Amino acid sequence: MGEASYQPIDAPPVHLIEARATTDLDQNYQPVRTPLAPDGSTVVLSTASFVLKFDRFLLPGSVSGAVGPESLCVSGDLAKQVRTYADCVNPIPLAPTYNPVQREVIFRQVEGMPGLVPGTRYALTVLGPVDDAAPSGIRAFDGAPLAESQRIEFTVAATNPPQAMPERQPSGDFYCQQDLECIGRTPDCQGDAPKDPTCFPCVKGAAKLLNACAGCHSDANAAAGLNLAVAALDPTVQQFRYNRVEPLYETAIGHAAHQTQMGERAHVGEKTPERFGRAMPLIDPGNPGNSYLLYKIIVGQIAVDPSLPADQAERLREEIERLRAAFVMGLPMPPPAYPASFWFHPQASADQEVTMYVDGMDILTAWILDGAEPRDCSVPLPP
């Protein structure tokens, strides 16, 4: 392992596992994304977004809003061979967001800019860096580049479903998100004046996931200086409420993880460190790929999809070991001796709770991407 600016890179190159695009809408009018067929037969909506899934964790800076668009060329010029983004003729403007849990980058079309034209054929080309020093192009977190450019053609449908709208980055109350099915089966959460107006048992957003870690990260036991106890007992009704935001602001949001503090001023969380992993914030608002808390969960078993084929699962375990060797130190979250209180993927047992998802992204990652703003869940959002 290494970094291009310091030493030769001794790590596997990045491979594209699949590229997906919006081909339909589900019953709730949300995007349905299917893999682009290598033979170019896929037909996508003109409002489509594109999801690229890789076999390695990426360097967030290479897929950031600043240079990330240059990692993908979508062009109607089928004759031009695209080796670098400079070769991309009349590219469709795209905005990337990175999901480290899934090792995916989603590229959405930029509103107000020229988009996909109905009935037109396009070529999608995934690009690596042009050289070792290039800031753009797909790279792994340790600097290893994309193994080779990948090109797939597709056609845009002549018409869209009438409900199709430009796809936007998800936003909402992901911190206090409630599970509607849970509300429907919880008597105290129903009616105009429920006994529990905050419906504590049905809050399934980021607040619940963070508080699940309070066994090791609380007021009395803030392991590594991190306090995630965001729930407290309301003595007036003898019920818990997710109403504490101070622990996150004081110990997590924008604060460098203790295990990444190296060098001068390393206690200050860095958004664009010269060396990835140095002084990484526990939670970096808007940037899940630079949020150490997610990586501490990723290196544990709760983030591994049990439905993966054996060979893919083994490669993922090897990649997780590379993360741990590079910068994710200490025990994972939760430690092996503790039972998991939530999962990022469905598990074998039906009683194991899976976190909510938003547009293909777990709600903790979605909350960080949306700005990582905690709030008092015991009061409703202002209209």
Label every PLM stretch briefly.
Residues 1-30, 40, 47-48, 125-128, ...:
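Aromatic- and Gly/Pro-enriched helix-to-coil junctions and flexible linker segments
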